[in-house]
Amino acid sequence: MYKTVLFDLDGTLLNTIDDLADSANRVCAAHGWPQYETAQYRYFVGNGIPKLVERFSPASCRSPEQLAATLAEFDKVYGAHMHDKTAPYPGMPALLARLKAAGVRMAVFSNKADEFARAVVARYFDADLFEVVRGALPDVPTKPATEGTRALMARLGVEADGSVLYVGDSNVDVETAHNAGLPCCGVLWGFRKREDLT
């Protein structure tokens, strides 16, 4: 039995895609840029908000200065709308409660900006479920790089010895687990298809 589970957030614990897509399209509309269907945003997300901003910005608007300005704009819009449609996946709160009752330690590890990751977890889940909630930090490479995973595991005092399971919904999560030497459970209710997890 696994003693510790590291969960991805968006597409794994929470269905956040509508709020992410709507916020991005609000930014696009404000600039007169093309907007995208929600289904397309499923492949824009996963590598962090800066990469999301780069993907929805037109090629002519991707200078470092332009992307920084668009990122700040997106953060403001998303911060105001990140709870409009977001919700836990059905059965997730009950599953987490059962794991907690069984003595399984749990943490959240997301490429979502740290402040947003903490905010949505605090909004939708009991405060004592997760020992650590960690989102993307400015000085730490995002998943699937190993630095963040190793730092999180060190904080939890665990090692890649077969007792830690990583759970996520995308190829980024599969790569994250592989790079850290962890077994991975890929969920099929999230943002990607089964073939994206192999």
Residue positions per predicted region:
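PG/GG-rich flexible active-site loop of Rossmann-like NAD(P)H-dependent oxidoreductases
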Residues: 191
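Generic enzyme active-site microenvironment
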Residues: 6-8, 109, 167
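Substrate-recognition "cap/lid" segment bordering the active-site pocket of phosphatases
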Residues: 84-87, 113-167, 171-180, 194-196
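N-terminal helical cap/lid subdomain that shapes the substrate entry/recognition surface
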Residues: 2-9, 13-94, 102, 115
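Surface-exposed amphipathic alpha-helices with a cationic face
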Residues: 93-101, 174-178
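Nucleotide-sugar donor-binding loop of glycosyltransferases
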Residues: 188
